[in-house]
């Protein structure tokens, strides 16, 4: 039964990811005054299917000097971790309702660094290794900010359980009261998922696609799926943390529809930023985090610790 549940849970995510690639190409096309994919199927709707067939029927190749085991394991692990992040997310009901859902997500997002590092090192290519090292430095750096923001939200929520955030936001979105945290969280998710303007790990002009430069066919598709799955997962997390709404037990489909629409709006914002912004310089990226975001998140964390004590009240305990 659990296997069926997992399949029913992962299949729509992978389907959404497949069509997200089409939406991205269409949105970027119209923003650049062109059509985007419009040949395969009506209005180009079958383009993701054609891409999948092409990638998974090609023969996967690897460099003769690469480390075989690590080279093959890295994309599989990347996709597995990306899909596992969805397990505790309440949409409005989670696959497994974890008491420490916030910590589980933090742990998995930290582990997602390893497949990138393995792929860069195992490829035995200087471009792949430089891209991997950039990715590790960037991801670990922004993990600190994400963890501090999550700690602040946890203090407001009074629990590590993600489902409680729906109850905390019954009267008002946390976006209204914690908008500086929400802004820093959104920018940090862009950096965490290696999206424009923080796509330094995949700098086409300087690193020839970055850590996955030596990958082709199925393994490349797995990295691609993992990246876009992480984008959707981070936007789903943003919706849960800052745009949550109380669960209507009489009409549960309304909750799911509301959650999906909010996540899609945030994903569209990701695409809009990609079409509009140039790439940051690497030193600017690090300065933004260590000199701006980290002091601010620490200050807000202390603020949210001190307010309940000062007002002689505690966060809502469920």
From Swiss-Prot:
InterPro entries registered for this protein in UniProt: NADH_UbQ_OxRdtase_su1/FPO, NADH_UbQ_OxRdtase_su1_CS
GO cellular component: mitochondrial inner membrane
Catalytic activity: a ubiquinone + NADH + 5 H(+)(in) = a ubiquinol + NAD(+) + 4 H(+)(out)
Protein name: NADH-ubiquinone oxidoreductase chain 1
Pfam family, one: NADHdh
Transmembrane segments: 3-23, 69-89, 100-120, 136-156, 172-192, 223-243, 253-273, 294-314
GO molecular function: NADH dehydrogenase (ubiquinone) activity
Protein family according to the UniProt entry: Belongs to the complex I subunit 1 family.
Membrane topology value: Multi-pass membrane protein
């Amino acid at each position: 039964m659990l296997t069926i549940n997992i399949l029913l849970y992962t299949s729509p995510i992978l389907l959404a990811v497949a069509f997200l690639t089409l939406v991205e190409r269409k949105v970027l096309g119209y923003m650049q005054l062109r059509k985007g994919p419009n040949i395969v199927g009506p209005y180009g709707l079958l383009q993701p299917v054609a891409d999948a067939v092409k990638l998974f029927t090609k023969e996967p190749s690897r460099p003769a000097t690469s480390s075989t085991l690590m080279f093959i394991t890295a994309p599989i692990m990347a996709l597995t971790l990306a899909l596992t992040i969805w397990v505790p997310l309440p949409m409005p009901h989670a696959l497994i309702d974890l008491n420490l859902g916030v910590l589980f997500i933090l742990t998995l997002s930290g582990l997602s660094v390893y497949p990138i590092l393995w792929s860069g090192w195992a490829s035995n290519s200087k471009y792949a290794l430089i891209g991997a090292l950039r990715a590790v430095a960037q991801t670990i750096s922004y993990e600190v900010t994400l963890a501090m923001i999550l700690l602040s939200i946890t203090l407001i929520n009074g629990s590590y359980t993600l489902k409680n955030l729906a109850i905390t936001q019954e009267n008002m979105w946390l976006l209204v009261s914690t908008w500086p945290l929400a802004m820093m969280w959104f920018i940090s998710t862009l950096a965490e998922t290696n999206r424009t303007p923080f796509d330094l790990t995949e700098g086409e002009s300087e690193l020839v696609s970055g850590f996955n430069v030596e990958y082709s066919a199925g393994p490349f598709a797995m990295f691609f799926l993992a990246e876009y799955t992480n984008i959707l997962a981070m936007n789903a997390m943003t919706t849960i943390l800052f745009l949550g709404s109380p669960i209507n037990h009489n009409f549960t489909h309304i909750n799911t529809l509301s959650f999906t629409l909010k996540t899609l709006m945030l994903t569209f914002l990701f695409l809009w930023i990609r079409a509009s912004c140039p790439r940051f310089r690497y030193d600017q990226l690090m300065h933004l985090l260590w000199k701006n975001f980290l002091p601010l998140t620490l200050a807000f964390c202390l603020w949210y610790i001190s307010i309940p004590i000062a007002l002689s009240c505690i966060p809502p305990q469920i």
